[in-house]
């Protein structure tokens, strides 16, 4: 551990103590040596006793900077781990930081291009259009076609700073894991590892560019979603160039109302887009907060979404998709037994789980939701409550399912903000039922066979040889089995004979011993003893030598 990391660790602990966050630790995590270290190394006391624990954590993360802000934002989606109060407070964290010098941005861009900016772009504006904790955006005009573009560039040395903070987080999480012991629900090391994978993915703008290109191609003919064009030839790990868009932020309800936007259609399209990305394309935008979503200015009666920032994308396996769809359908059919079965069948919880106890726990949580009208039931909260319940049965929450839950909560909140009467179930149910119908039956089977056709057509010429080899192997196997059977029968015969002789010898030896104490002829006991000994020797020598068949 370097001096810099020790200094940073001290600063982090000092900040957390300033906000009194040691007060929320359970007693088992504050043994005497912890208290001694706290009082000798840190003489700071809680300066914010008037604030709740969740608010203090939010303020501490805000003060610690971008990496901790992003961690807080991610934790706000883990309501299966945190209380609603804490999660709500962390959701208020804003990834807003002062911009860095435009001259430094120019140097960073030119380092990636390996040429002056003016070689490829005109009108480069050193004043950023927007800035965030990881990157900054500048406007320019493409020299080759005169089109307006934006250049997204990483902050100087951001990778080093993030790696240092991640290392510190990881080490701290392991210590907390150790203090909490086996069976703790928080699993801090697991949470930090998920966060590490997510944030490191955001540090590669080339990967983000490829994600954007793929998402754009998936919706190239869509009238519901537009992804700006990415100029791949100008994309590098620390630089990304894409088409500039001119939309209205989805959070600007006043501007959307002023242009006469069809809010009902917009809200329904948002839900359809989510389920299309998840179930049709298996590739969904997992960072759909309001800052990344804009609405088109033209044709407000037929509005479409404009999606930005494809740094975090989610995918699900075919198995996860199927179980997820069945979960939602089973929930709205109030089939809690099926939900419990699905969690076990999918491997999300152990097959050793008590099915009846799990079903009862799900029923206790889900049944009260039906006291509301269907159009007020939240998909995201259904998924959240199911995960939270399953947590008590040692669920292994997959990172992609956490991303899905977060995205679903964003989409629902957005949809109901745009159109409070949105009936999410009526919008999504036909889509889910159609998708499930496509997964079973003759059409689904034909489709699966069709996708495998090139593979099997390539293997078809090998079939005659494979059949011949298998028949040949079968004959050898039958012959081998017959030999094994013969050996086994011979072994059994030898064993029976040996056992018979040994038992008979034992009887004769016992009889000979008893006859010594009886009024028998002097010869009788000796005949029995000698016969018994001879039979024992013959029986012992006739035992099967081994059991290898």
UniProtKB/Swiss-Prot annotation:
| Gene Ontology biological process terms from the UniProt entry | regulation of ubiquinone biosynthetic process; ubiquinone biosynthetic process
Keyword Membrane included in the entry's annotation: yes
What superkingdom heads the lineage? Bacteria
Any one of the GO CC terms: plasma membrane
Q: Topology relative to the membrane, per the entry?
A: Multi-pass membrane protein
Q: Enumerate the Pfam families for this protein.
A: ABC1 (PF03109)
Matches recorded under InterPro entries:
ABC1_dom, Kinase-like_dom_sf, UbiB, UbiB_bact, UbiB_kinase
Segments spanning the bilayer are 498-518, 520-540
Q: Does the keyword Transferase apply?
A: yes
Question: Where along the chain is the active site annotated?
Answer: 287
Name of the protein in question: Probable protein kinase UbiB
Name of the gene: ubiB
